[in-house]
């Protein structure tokens, strides 16, 4: 067991039988291409979605599939997971390469969110689904207790699409303008073009989806200005 991980384990609320799982979950690709947290992150993403989906299904019996999807998206989006990782002090235990450390990687939302998902998988493998579910629900309790159907809204791309359909206009076209950065840490720039309204907006983000959402949100802000 590496020094300090026992303290993190207590913070997480789980006594690991195999601390190498926790070490792997904290290891960024910049440290080791072949032995890092990417596989655990892949598994943890699915487990987290399953647990939160089930919890929302039980808590909101009258919610539609679309409403449940938006509730889940709010809870498991990268920004939320990064906030939780900070609350759990995961940032203090990340294993990063020299370059990532110098560039502030321990506070980068995408790295924090990925590490939290990897830790979820590590706990699942080490302690089983029941243990993992109990801990995840405990971590999310405050957010689960405060989220409501009144507080959720459709994402910008959906809002824009519905507006255009209601006005019998062609849907927007999203085009990648540029992609910068390493393969595991890319930054996207995307144009959203609505030809009928002569609107063109630029969105940026750490994924194509995030860039498209930002571009759509900017386009929505321009809609009232157009006849």
Locate predicted features.
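Double-stranded RNA-binding/processing signature
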Residues: 1-227
């Amino acid at each position: 067991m590496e020094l300090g991980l026992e303290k993190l384990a207590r913070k997480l609320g789980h006594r690991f039988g195999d601390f190498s799982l926790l070490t792997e979950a904290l290891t960024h690709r910049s440290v080791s291409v072949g032995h890092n947290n990417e596989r655990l992150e892949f598994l943890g993403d699915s487990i987290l979605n399953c647990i939160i989906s089930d919890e929302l299904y039980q808590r909101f019996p009258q919610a539609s599939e679309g409403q449940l999807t938006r509730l889940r998206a709010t809870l498991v989006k990268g920004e939320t997971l990064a906030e939780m990782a900070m609350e759990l002090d995961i940032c203090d235990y990340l294993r990063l390469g020299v370059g990532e450390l110098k560039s502030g990687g321990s506070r980068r939302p995408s790295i924090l969110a990925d590490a939290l998902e990897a830790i979820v998988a590590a706990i699942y493998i080490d302690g089983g689904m029941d243990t993992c579910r109990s801990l995840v629900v405990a971590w999310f309790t405050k957010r689960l207790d405060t989220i409501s159907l009144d507080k959720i809204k459709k994402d910008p791309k959906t809002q824009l699409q519905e507006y255009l359909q209601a006005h019998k206009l062609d849907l927007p076209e999203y085009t990648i303008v540029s992609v910068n950065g390493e393969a595991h840490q890319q930054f996207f720039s995307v144009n959203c073009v609505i030809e009928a309204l002569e609107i063109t907006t630029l969105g940026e983000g750490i994924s194509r989806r995030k860039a498209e959402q930002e571009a759509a949100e900017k386009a929505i802000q321009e809609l009232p200005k157009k006849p």
